[in-house]
């Protein structure tokens, strides 16, 4: 589909759904074809447009904050697969999320092959130290998500310094505040990592302000 035809198909799906607020997921697959890995054998790609309600976390967790563990499952190195690619291959993320469930946590932090923070299973990671808002760069394996980009503008409006740099778990342990962002999740406070309290152990004031700003 051409760009405008695709945009109209999305609008048509939204109109047919009748929702004023919802989540749009656009999926493009290689379409029908024989068994095998070669996409050239599938000349007719398939486009799927999904419009639905999406609740990633229960409302109570936005008020209390979530507990996160560090997964043994690592993020694929950026040199192997470009983290800017938004694909349906979530196997490593699913494995990490299962680790979180087994540990009684809500989410799992994924490190890259060098042991630095990449992202969580479906969200970008942020740590606040003073007026510095820290987040891993995409080169560490983090997806350059939509909400992450919006957060950059909101941080500047709040007078925060936006800092993309390598982060270890220690940087999260000693952070004043920590939170995750995602298109569906929005802004999710993190109050503990691997059983260690972060900040006051409650959602911090900057996290709450950024969350409120995202909705204005």
Predicted regions, residues:
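Glycine- and Gly-Pro-enriched alpha-helical subdomains that act as flexible
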Residues: 108-109, 116-139, 144
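Conserved alpha/beta cores of soluble small-molecule-handling proteins
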Residues: 1-109, 113-116, 143, 153-216
